Amino acid sequence: RLHLTAHFNNEVNESVTHAATVRSAIVKLDGTAITERDDTPIVHTSNYKEMLTEAYETEKKAVETYRQILPLVEKIGDTELYDSLEVVYFDEQRSVEELRMMLKD
């Protein structure tokens, strides 16, 4: 499954970009960006279907998180911030769809 290597490498790069966007948003709102991992277990596997399923569930959670955040940012009235987070939201939606299609194969 060599195509998975490229997929997950792209996801890593996208995640780093998203983290920088969110960190900037937090700082812009006078917050303090911290790194604290949630308690969701990390699944270690060589089963590609399991990898894709775990990634799919993670991306769905990200989509839901950004879906909840966007209206809050819209209330603030900061269109630049809204636009940057909306791009992340759309990226996450695209990832969900890509993973859904990969799981169908």
What is each model feature region?
Residues 15, 38-50, 102-105:
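Generic structural signal for short, solvent-exposed loop/turn connectors between secondary structure elements
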Residues 2-36, 98-103:
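Conserved alpha-helical segments that form or flank metal/cofactor-binding pockets of metalloenzymes
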Residues 20, 24-25, 41-95:
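Acidic/histidine-rich alpha-helical segments that form the ligand environment
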